[in-house]
Amino acid sequence: MAYGVSVYLANKILDHICRNVAYTPPATVYAKMHTGDPGAAGTANASSVATRYACAFAAAASGSISQSNTPEHTLSATESIAGVSFWDHPTAGNFLWSSQAAASKSGASGDIIRINTDTLTLGPLAA
């Protein structure tokens, strides 16, 4: 799978808009680090650290929404972080979408890697 919106989230959005099926969005979205593509279920290539980090987002504009905080991930082993999956729960829940890192970041145990920015875009938009 390429990075992107999960089947779960796509179906929830479409059912909500087109079928009037209620969808309750999560109060908080959580980020999980990965050493490669998280895959269709969001669970592949997971970092050795199981923690998911709370994310905050600015208001959507022009079909995009951007992260407004900077979660920090402390490595517990030597690894390279290449992507992030986003979830609706800190430990269980549903996989929402994944994003590829602009550049993979490598480090050793104790090093900190930050998510400086993440933007989810729905498009193309009608012009």
Model-derived features: positions:
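Small cysteine-rich, disulfide-bonded extracellular modules of the LU/uPAR three-finger superfamily
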Residues: M1-V84, D88-A127
